[in-house]
Amino acid sequence: MASLQANATSSLQYQTAPLESSHIPGSPHSVHVLLEGYSKDVGGDLFQADGSVTLIQGPLTVLVDTAGPWSRDSLLQSLQNQGVAPADVTHVICTHGHSDHVGNLNLFSHAEILVSYDLWRNGYYVAHDFRAGVPYVLPGGEGLEVVATPGHTGSDISLLVPGTSLGTVVVAGDLFEREGDGDSWQPLSEDPERQEDSRAAILKVADVIIPGHGPPFRVIKHGQLAQQETKNN
């Protein structure tokens, strides 16, 4: 990720497009959005929100974010619908420590747990230098990689999932609120400048982004756009 960040400020031409399905098959990894995040202005100073929850299945069974505690029953039912019990989950990755992303961690106490830059394995804290831009490669994960994407908070992380039918999927938490979020994410950001750099870095490598509070979307780069136009002509 360090090399990505070094090039993050260079221009990138791309388009986004909605993804029609919450399931992305692939080998060695498939991705399923169990709960789609949302954020609603309900009037006054009140918002109603919950974070997306994503299941990655392959050599490991990985859950990214756990939603808020108010979504416990929905999360358990969604896992059950996929034939997954909480005890089957090998790794839980929380993109940051806000309550709508970590609210059900207690369901997965046996799993390796990564919350922001803090990694726990078998009840022990394991040091990892995310602040220096060192990615965390999940052992046995066949390319699953956690990278630092600070900005929304000072220690946000994202999971890179290669080997799907649509290419590399990035589960990005609140790095992206939703497709086409424009500048609306900036008031929610602890450090908008760093977040802008993190967003640019992820856009360079992602074919699909799963945001924190909206449906997944495709990222179509300039070269891909040119190829599509050639095919259409």
Curated annotation (Swiss-Prot):
EC number, UniProt record: 3.1.27.-
Listed cofactors: Zn(2+)
GO biological process: histone mRNA metabolic process; positive regulation of G1/S transition of mitotic cell cycle
A single MF term (Gene Ontology): RNA endonuclease activity
Coiled-coil annotated spans: none
Cited Pfam families: Lactamase_B
Compartment(s): Cytoplasm, Cytosol; Nucleus
Cofactor-binding details, from the entry: Binds 2 Zn(2+) ions per subunit.
PANTHER family: METALLO-BETA-LACTAMASE DOMAIN-CONTAINING PROTEIN 1
Record function comment: Endoribonuclease that catalyzes the hydrolysis of histone-coding pre-mRNA 3'-end. Involved in histone pre-mRNA processing during the S-phase of the cell cycle, which is required for entering/progressing through S-phase. Cleaves histone pre-mRNA at a major and a minor cleavage site after the 5'-ACCCA-3' and the 5'-ACCCACA-3' sequence, respectively, and located downstream of the stem-loop. May require the presence of the HDE element located at the histone pre-RNA 3'-end to avoid non-specific cleavage.
Record protein name field: Metallo-beta-lactamase domain-containing protein 1
Source organism of the structure: Xenopus laevis
Name of encoding gene: mblac1
